Structures are given as structure tokens and as C-alpha cells.
Amino acid sequence: MRRIHLLILFFIALSVHAQFTKFVDPKIGSEGQGRVFIGPSMPYGMVKPGPDCVSMPNAGWEKMPEAVKGFSQTHVSGTGGGQKYGNILIQPFKGTALMTEYPQHRSAETMSLGYYSCDYEEGPHTEITTSERCAIYRFRNLDGLFVDAHTFLGIDTIPDKREAQQFVGSAIKINGEYEITGYSTVRGGWNNGGPYTVYFCLKSDAPFKKSIAKDNKYAWVMFDKSTVNVKVGISFVSTDKARQNIVSSGFDAQLSHLLSTWNALLSKIKINASESQSRMFYTALYHTMLMPVDRSGENPNWTAVPYYDDYYAIWDTYRTSSPLITLLTPQRQRDIVNSLINIYDNEGYMPDARSGNCNGRTQGGSNADIVIADAFAKGLSGIDYEHAFKAMIKDAEVAPADAEKEGRGGIAEYNSLGYIPYGIDRAGNRTVEYSYDDWCIAQVAKGLGHNALYAKYLKRSGNWHNLWRSDYQWQGMRGFIMPRGADGNWLDSVVWGKSKSIILLSPILPTLRLHHGIFLGGEHSSMKPFRQNIV
């Protein structure tokens, strides 16, 4: 009877906010290489609790019959490359055996915006929702709960293996009959970043009948009750802060608040479309607001706010979700831009990508410059553009110590030759993207009245011409960006998809990155068939 009552409350909460949230299907994009996070999340939420399967895909989830290791509290969404996060794993279990792994198979599973549930074949039933910094669980038909502070996604023991996450240290402590605290410190992952620490505070509404902690890695707690509500506060600063991040609201109240919050955002765009089209549209809109994540007040290295992390990567988002956020929620984009400036103030460069409180990895250009220029062009208020302009100039002029982490690689060659020669990784991509970055710097310089700098960077924005090869033909089309040596000679053969000079599958794609001056040749161009295909 209790379960029926809880289901009724859940569906009431869902129906109240169903006007737009009902169209969001978290499963879209989650299978294969999509790697979209399927669990509950607040907009730009720091905590993203969800299942982690044994195969350890980037966002944790894999379809049945893949076994589930447990539910961790931190995830990214829709990312490629190596894994990141998957910290602080909890797993309900039946029986009394104390093991360090409890992989279990699902017999049923439900997911919707802000809500996830599954039944294990072994018996336990799990429901999950979340606040910005606290995961909320409702367990039924369990005997105990296993807490693992030392595991995570993409774990690897090979020292300094590229893109692998590696264990640094952990601690776990049982505080009385209702609370467990601890932390997990991990380094590496997709951006090859330095160590980051995730602190947690777990609180149960049922007392522990029995509790054991071991090796500063694991804890097991047993219950007399078969229904247990658990909250897991998360912090990147301290266990005390994790405890403060635990919300007072219960499962259903928090779910209702989450749905109301999302509905307000999704309702900013209304479309006249079929149900299937609406489902695709609002799910895509929802996905644009999962990252970056708001960690204001949760930075262990400095206190300036706002602070956002998990820019994954600005190379991808400057032309997609970032301009959209500027239009839909300008106050949010203002905070994101100011966060980029705060990162520059404290670490020396704005990121092109960032995760786990570390910049990296750069993709094609210094693309935070484009985000600043977009905000400036749209008149976004509350930003010190003169100060932001200094960060843009540093990107353009000062070579970083580690060009994979931040800044512009090959900047000396770019500024002296007017292009980056092959032999330097991503030479073609970087030349094209630095040209557009410089065009963006020029626009901000003009708007701020820096006329000499405007002329300088406008001229440099034409550097892509130095890699334009008008006689190169590919699949019946002619005229493309192509790699060139420091001696001025062209690289005649490029194995597309395998070249370090241009990291794309065809010469078309870097050519299309010329947002400020694309050459498509007019009506009589050999590019006409391609133009017709992409329209």
C-alpha cells in the first residue's frame, strides 16, 4: 500500500509540470557513442546521480542486461574520449555478505526528467532524484547499503595512462547511527587533469543496525527497515560543506521543485509541432542545460564567484548551446562568462575545455574568445569587457607552458608565418580557428575603441588565406584548406581522419570553420553540390 501511495505522489508531481517536461526523454542519445547522462539533474547541476554499469561508459549508464555496479553522484553528459567522475558509489543489497563489489542486474527500469528508478533481480528497488548539490534516494526491499569512496569511472592502475582516471586517496567514516562522511581524490581522466577531491556526507532516515568501515575505502550499513530514504550531499571543498549541501526537502517535494524549475526554462521556447518532433526538440533543449555545471562556492582553489566547471568543450559549445543560453537566460550566460574571466584571473588563461577544476584539453582554438565576443555583440550586461579583453589578448600573444591544457599551441609560428606549418599537431585546424578567434578579438577591440588593435587583429583574421589551396580537388569539388610546411610547400596527400595536421574526416569541415569569411564560390562553384546537401 505504501508503494502505491508513493507512486501516486510521483505521478501527481509529474502531471503538475507536464506541459513541457513531458516531452523530455533522457534516454535519447544515451546509447552507443551518444553517452548522454540519463539520471536526474537540475539545470547546470553539480550533482548528477545515476547508475554506473560494469562496462563504465562515460555517463555511467548502459542498457540492460549490463550489470550495475552502483549509483555514483557525479557524471558528465554526452562526452567523447576518456571518462571523468563517477565518484562516491552507493549500492543497495540483500543478504549479509560484506563484499567490495555488488554488481546486480536490472529486471525493470524507468527514467524521465528528474527521476530514475530500477528494480534489481536480487530484490532491491531504487528511486533517485536530486537537487543542485544533493542526491536523494529512496530504497525499498534492501537489507543493507554499500558505500565505496575509492572507485570511479575509467579507473586504471597503469601510471599516468593517458585519459585514464587514477586513484589518489580516500577516506570514509561512520558517524553514529545515521551518517557517513568521507572523500575521494582522483586525478587524470579525459582532460589529463590534476587531482580533484569529491567530499560527501550521507544521511539516512533509518538507523544503522550494524555498520562497518574498512581501509578508508568502504563502508557497509545494515537496516532493520526495508524502506530507507538516503540523501548524499556533495562538495568539492569539505565534508562540512557537503553536510551543509544536504537539502531539507523530501523526495517528492524535491522532484516537484526540479520539474517546476525545468518547466520554466523549457517553456521559454514554444513550438507548433507533432509529439515526436516536440520530444526531439525539448530533449535537445534539455541537454544544452546540463553542462557546464555551476560550482559557485565549491572551488577549493579560490573563493571568487561565479565559478563554473565542466566546459566540455567550448570548441563544441561556442557555436551551439552557448549563443542559445545568451538569448534564453542572459543572467546565466553572464555568470558563465564571468566564470571564464575568474579562471583567467586565478590561473592565467581562460579554458577551451575544463573539468575537475583543471583546464584542458584544448581542441582547435582559444574559443573562450568567441564566447566573450558573442556576449559583447549581444550587449550582455554585468561583464567587465575591458578586463575580458585582456584575457583575449593573452590568448592571442602569449604561448602557454602546456598548449594541450590552455592557450594557443604554435602561436609563435602562427604570428610569424601567418599560419601554423604541418609538423605541429592540428596545424590546419588551429590556423583556421585562430583566424576566427582573431576576428572576434578585432570586433571587441573595435567596440571598445582600441582602433590600432582592431586593425591588427582584423588583418590577422585573414591568416587562413595562407592555407587556402584553390587548385586542390576532392570528390569533384575544388578549393580547400590544406596543410603547408614552414618552407611554404604544400602537403599534397592527406589521409583524412588519420592526419595530425587536420583532425577531421574531410577537407570540407575545416573549410566550413571559416565563419567570418567562408569561400563557397558562388553559383558556379564546384562546391554547389555540397552546399545543396547541407541546406
Predicted features and spans:
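Bacterial Sec-dependent N-terminal signal peptides
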Residues: 1-19
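ATP-dependent phospho-/nucleotidyl transfer catalytic cores
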Residues: 437
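Accessory carbohydrate-recognition regions in carbohydrate-active enzymes
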Residues: 19-370, 376-432, 440-466, 472-478, ...
